[in-house]
Amino acid sequence: VLIVCEGSKTEPNYFRELVDHLRLNTANIEIDGDSDPSPKSVVAHAKRRYQQEEGFDRVFCVFDKDEHSTYQQAVRDLAAEEVTDVFTAITSVPCFEYWLLLHFIFTTKPYARSEAYSPGQHVMRDLKLHLPAYSKGSQHVYYQLMPQTDLAIRHSERAGQQAAQNQTDNPTTQVHRLVTYLRALKNS
């Protein structure tokens, strides 16, 4: 399993902590935060690694929409690849921190740019109401939130259903799909 993350710290830290907690064999799961921080770069990096290295039966590309101009192209590129059942897009709109916020509250409030803040910065402000010490790249976030992971999964699934009904993706996250997949690996 290869997990390629847009972020070099926050997302890789979270998934490394999850893999560690589940006691999954790290020889079989590689978490890569070395791509450039754009959705298109994440997808290109993941495809390159998959083509150059053998042994990856699943490849997850973890990236945010926030205000990235290459988001839609990356989603389309992966949709074309998903027919192989190898590549999966794990998107968050507007950002990964929305997944973290769902550990505390259910919200489908759309996040938009204001004069002072990007959509992602608005999510960060909401998250800090519940997790005041959080900052990008924080360590041990998974362990802090672990007791609420099942709640976050339910919130994420519900938000996705509501977003589909409302024909929007703001806000949504697919991180629950990767968390559920990794949990299933532990039980297989």
Regions found by a protein language model. Give the residues of each.
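Short phosphate-binding loop-to-helix
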Residues: S35-H45
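Short amphipathic alpha-helix with an adjacent loop that forms part of the alpha/beta core around
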Residues: H45-Q51
